[in-house]
Each structure stands twice: as C-alpha cells, then as structure tokens.
C-alpha cells in the first residue's frame, strides 16, 4: 500500500525530526529530506504537502540554504516554520531583517486575519519563538494572519497558492495550539486521509520481510531492550523459525538482566541462543577509556560474536538489528553532524560476514516502536521496559571499564530503579539510570576518611528521545536512593543528580 506522503525539507534546525514525529502522530506518513535533494525527491514522490523547517542560518548569508523556486510552482501546499518562513518571504519579495535582540521563548500570538490554517484556534495563544531574523515586510500576495508584540509578521498565508508560514515553532510542546495548526495544514489544506497507522505498518513490514528473506535464515542481535525485543517479535511473526535470536551476555548488563532476558525469550516460537562472552569483551576493553573507542570496540565484538554463532547455526544470510530513527539521526546520516556513534549504525565494522542487514524499525521513533509492540500483542512489561543502550553499562562507566566498577554500578543502578518504582513514578519518567564517574572524592564514614567514586543519577522525561528534560524527582525519593546506595554499596561516597536537558547534553553520558 502506498501511503500519502508529506516531505519535511531539512534546513538544519534542531527540531527537524520533531516535526516528522508530530506529522506521524497525526496519522500521516512523512520523510525528512535535505534541502539540496528536495526538488528531485518531491518530483519523484509527489507528496500531498511540504514543510520547510527552521535552521540556524540567515537567508541573506553567503552559502545559506536556499530552495529551488520551481517548488513553489508545483501546486503542492507548503508550510514554512521559522527559517522556512523567512525563506518563503524573501523568495516572494518580502523583507527579512536582523532583529536587534534575539527572540527566544514563549510569547503571545494574536490572530489578525482568519485563515484555513488557523481553523479552531484561539484569538490569542502562546507560541514558542527562537529566531534572530524577522520578516519586517510581508511578501506580495500574502496576508498577515498572526502578530506578536515584538514580531508584527508572526504568520502569513497565501490561500490561493496554499502557501503558509509561521515565525514560531508549532512542533514544540511550548506552542500550545501547535498541534492544531499542523493538523489543519495536513487535513484542511493537504486533504490527508490519515492512513499511517501501526496496524498498516505491521502488515506491510511482515510482507516486506517475507519478500526480502524468503526461506533464508536471519540472525538477530537481541539485547532484551525495547527496540530489539519488538524487532524480534516482528521478525518472529514474519518468518518464524527462520529467525535465530542471539543474546550476547557481554558482562555489561544490569543486575539479573541476563537471566530475565532468557526467561522472556527462550520459548518454542524462537530459536534462542545465549552466549556468555563476558571475558571476551572485558579483555578487548582493558585499558580503553575513550567513549567513542569503547563504542566501536563493543560494536565490532558484537559482530564477531554473531559471526561465530552464525557458523554454528549454518547458512545465515541476514543480520537483523533494532535500529530506530533517532539512532540514524544521531549517527550523522545526511547533513546532520555526528553527535556520537550509535552501536547499531556507526559501530559496524567495514567487513560483515552476512549478505545484508535488515533493520525493520529504522524509520520509527521510540514511541512508535512501543505502539508496534502493543500491536504485536507483546506483554506491557517488555514494551515499556527501561531503554538500555547496546553497549550496556560500558557507556555508563566513565573511563576504563573494570569488574569492580561494573559491580558497584549494577548495585547502585538497581537501588535507584527500585526506589523510583516504589515511589510509583516509574511510568512518569522515560529513562532513569546510574553512572559511575571516573572521579574519586574525599568523604567521611564513621571515624574514617574515604576516597571513593562519585556516582551520578540521570533521569529524563521525553516524548521522542530527540529532545529531553531532566526529571523533577521528589527530594525524598532522591534522599532514600542516596542513603541506600551509601549504606549498601561499597566504594561510593558521593552522589550527584544530573539536571541537564537534551540538548545541550545527550541522555547517556558517553
């Protein structure tokens, strides 16, 4: 089934993937395309709508991202956001100027003229601004449909050409009626049918996997995390016993996790293999402290283990991975800069002894993966399991990985997760874990001086893992956690709580 498509044209802004997420939440499929490739892709795929994203540049800067004007003649509805609005305004004869002061944060937008894209919206509503340039004179043929106290041209519309633009960011939660505006664009202007659902995706992926694999064998790296678990369930539904799930116990798992994974997946519907590779991994990681190098080593050793298991199993043509959309984005695909190498993307060795990779989840955001898991009738405790990176505790141990650090971290992390669950806030926090730093500090226990590790606690709330806010855990929960860790875990004498959002920080420390 060919879905209706919206193309999100990427000009390099920080919220570009979030826009895609918002569109999909409204049951319309979309793809993100770099601006340099936009015209060719749009001509080829014939989307029902186009969205221009924000970006860090000024439209008048030399080498700033531009768009072929032919796109405006294709009779496809367009919505510009932030930089996208400035670009549309410039190309249609409006005036864009540098603001005296950057406008960043919440402001009140007032409707000045009615428009189809504002249907059902309040006369005044809170919007989120983040710009240094602004449109001082509207382009020819456009009406000003919203204003703010500091931005007289906050939104514009050309109803005849079906081109609309807003200076603010409707995709972020801070813009109170942003979802309504995007929905109006999709359904009132682009006439979307809303045919993007997990039920449809599941049916299509099963057929696609069967067509790709045929009667050949697939080897899946199963970590027990949400992504690989849903991937396993999907592949099992599609190809049954032609799937072998290999769980590599690399010695970098959380407390009791290896046994829990085996209990969950060792059944008659899957070929399940557990490999105890702890010594193999720790020997490779000995003396290594650079986080990128650790990720690469862990990623490569995973593949080597899979190759060894494949030889035991027999002819294996495909390696399957639970790669999801944020993994691809963070690993610097397209025009994005590399933030960190993801174990499912950047950590792959150049030579892999498999015919091909299968990544059936690579177009899905985390929340879509969970919805797919529920569609597959997976138990909720698996679908809502705490996210856990492929490199495991290897990237939650700062500096060199040692057995002592791993054991300390396992116990401390278990206590933190236990206290969060006891407080009944585990469903309110999207990810929470402990990190053992490479710093030792002076402390006092009883009458004795100590010189032990500092432990960090990290907890975030997020809807898509592309952006995240630090979780406001009650002080009493943090206090209970701290007291238990200090009393029950050796070699920890100081505990800190990470109050950094993403961006600027990533969720993991390494």
UniProtKB/Swiss-Prot annotation:
- What pathway does this protein act in? Purine metabolism; GMP biosynthesis; GMP from XMP (L-Gln route): step 1/1
Signal peptide as annotated in the record: none
Zinc-finger among keywords:
no
From the record, give the cysteines joined by S-S bonds: none
- Pfam name, any one: GATase
EC number of the protein: 6.3.5.2
Q: Where are the transmembrane segments?
A: none
- Group of enzyme by EC: ligase
Spell out the reaction equation it catalyses: XMP + L-glutamine + ATP + H2O = GMP + L-glutamate + AMP + diphosphate + 2 H(+)
Where, by residue number, does ATP bind? 223-229
Kindly state which keywords UniProt assigns to this record, in alphabetical order.
ATP-binding, Glutamine amidotransferase, GMP biosynthesis, Ligase, Nucleotide-binding, Purine biosynthesis
Q: Which PANTHER family match?
A: GMP SYNTHASE [GLUTAMINE-HYDROLYZING], GMP SYNTHASE-RELATED
Primary role: Catalyzes the synthesis of GMP from XMP.
Q: How does it assemble?
A: Homodimer.
- By what name is this protein known? GMP synthase [glutamine-hydrolyzing]
Species whose genome carries this gene: Finegoldia magna (strain ATCC 29328 / DSM 20472 / WAL 2508) (Peptostreptococcus magnus)
Q: Lineage from the top down?
A: Bacteria, Bacillati, Bacillota, Tissierellia, Tissierellales
Q: Which gene is transcribed and translated to give this protein?
A: guaA
